[in-house]
Curated annotation (Swiss-Prot):
GO cellular component, one term: nucleolus
Sequence ranges of Acidic residues compositional bias: 193-210, 218-232, 240-262
Gene behind the chain: mak16
Function according to Swiss-Prot or TrEMBL: Plays an essential role in early embryonic development.
Amino acid composition bias (Basic residues), ranges on this chain: 266-283
GO biological process assignments: maturation of 5.8S rRNA; maturation of LSU-rRNA
Recorded phenotype for the gene knockout or disruption: Embryos show various defects including CNS necrosis, a thin yolk sac extension and small head and eyes.
Cell compartment(s), UniProt: Nucleus, Nucleolus
Name of the protein this chain belongs to: Protein MAK16 homolog
Pfam families tied to this protein: Mak16, Ribosomal_L28e
Family: Belongs to the MAK16 family.
Highest taxon, organism lineage: Eukaryota
C-alpha cells in the first residue's frame, strides 16, 4: 500500500532523494512532473497519490493527472489530456477536469499554463525575426578559400588586361583579321560601340526636336533673373554691332588707302611700259624728273 506521509518522511527529511537539489536558501526538485520545481510536501509528485501538472511537448500543452486507483498500474498511472491552444479554453478545461481537486493544485496548474504559453509566444516571435547564424569554419578551410579568392582575382585582372589590350590593337588596326580572338569579347566591344552610336543619334534627334518647339510662359514664371539675362544679351548685341561698325570703317579706310597707292604706282609706271614685239632689249635704268613752272602772282593780277 502507498502511504504519502511515510514516503515523505523517507525521502523528504531523513534519507536521500535523487531528484533533490540542495542550495543555501532552499531545496529544489528535478522531477519532470513537479508542478512548482520546489522540494516540499505539497508539491512532491512522489509523496502525493492525487496529483496533477501541466507539461509542454512540441509546442502543445497537456494536463497530466494521477489518482490512487491507478497506483497499482505504473504504465497507466498518469492520465494525459490535450489542452486547447486558446488560453481561455485551456483554463476552462483545467477547471472541468480538476473540479473536485484541491485548490492549491488547480491554482498551480493554471499558473504553470500561463508561464508555458508566455514562453511559447516568445519563441514564436524570435523565430519570425531574422537572426544571424554563426557557422564555425576550420582554419584550413578558411586559408584554402582565401587562396582561391586571391588566385581568382589575379586571373580576372589578367584576363581583363589582355582583353583590353587586344581590343585596343583591334581598334588601331594592327591586326588585319581576327586570329585566336575570343568572340564574346569582340561581341561585347561591338555592342558597346553600337550603344554609343545609338546614344549619340538619340541626343541629336532630341536636339532637333527641341529646336522647333514652342512654349508659352506665364508672367509669374518670368523671373527677374530672366530679365537680367535678356538685358545682358541686348548689351552683348549692341557691343557686337559697334565692333562690326568699327571693323567696317577700318576696312573702308584700308581700301581707300590701297586705291590711292595703286593710283600713284600707275602714274609712276606710265613711262616704263615695255616694248611690244619678239625682240626686247634691256635698257639702262633712267630717272626722269618733272618740273612745273608757275607764273608769279603779280603778273596775273596785272593782266
Amino acid at each position: 500500500m502507498q502511504h504519502d506521509d511515510v514516503i515523505w518522511d523517507l525521502i523528504g527529511n531523513k534519507s536521500f532523494c535523487s531528484y533533490k537539489v540542495k542550495t543555501k536558501t532552499q531545496q529544489f526538485c528535478r522531477n519532470e512532473y513537479n508542478i512548482t520545481g520546489l522540494c516540499n510536501r505539497s508539491s512532491c509528485p512522489l509523496a502525493n497519490s492525487q496529483y496533477a501538472t501541466i507539461r509542454e511537448e512540441k509546442g502543445q500543452c497537456f494536463l497530466y493527472m494521477k489518482v490512487i486507483e491507478r497506483a497499482a498500474f505504473p504504465s497507466r498511472m498518469w492520465e494525459k489530456v490535450k489542452l486547447d491552444r486558446n488560453y481561455a479554453k485551456a483554463l476552462e478545461q483545467i477547471d472541468e477536469n480538476l473540479i473536485y481537486w484541491p485548490r492549491f493544485i488547480r491554482h498551480k496548474c493554471k499558473q504553470r499554463l500561463t508561464k508555458i504559453t508566455q514562453y511559447l509566444i516568445r519563441i514564436r516571435k524570435l523565430t519570425l525575426k531574422r537572426q544571424r547564424k554563426l557557422v564555425p569554419l576550420s582554419r584550413k578551410v578558411e586559408r584554402r578559400e582565401k587562396r582561391r579568392e586571391e588566385k581568382a582575382l589575379i586571373a580576372a585582372q589578367l584576363e581583363n588586361a589582355i582583353e583590353k589590350e587586344l581590343l585596343d590593337r583591334l581598334k588601331q588596326g594592327t591586326y588585319g583579321d581576327i586570329y585566336n580572338f575570343p568572340i564574346n569579347a569582340f561581341d561585347k566591344a561591338m555592342e558597346k560601340q553600337d550603344e554609343e552610336s545609338e546614344s549619340e543619334e538619340e541626343e541629336e534627334e532630341e536636339d532637333e526636336e527641341e529646336s522647333g518647339t514652342r512654349e508659352f510662359i506665364a508672367e509669374d514664371e518670368f523671373e527677374e533673373s530672366d530679365l537680367s539675362d535678356f538685358e545682358e544679351l541686348n548689351n552683348l548685341k549692341d557691343s557686337s554691332d559697334e565692333e562690326v561698325n568699327d571693323e567696317e570703317e577700318s576696312s573702308e579706310e584700308s581700301e581707300e588707302e590701297s586705291e590711292e597707292e595703286e593710283v600713284k604706282s600707275k602714274a609712276k609706271s606710265k613711262g616704263k611700259a615695255p616694248l611690244k614685239g619678239p625682240s626686247r632689249k634691256k635698257r639702262a635704268y633712267v630717272e626722269i624728273e618733272y618740273e612745273q613752272e608757275t607764273e608769279p602772282a603779280q603778273k596775273s593780277k596785272a593782266t
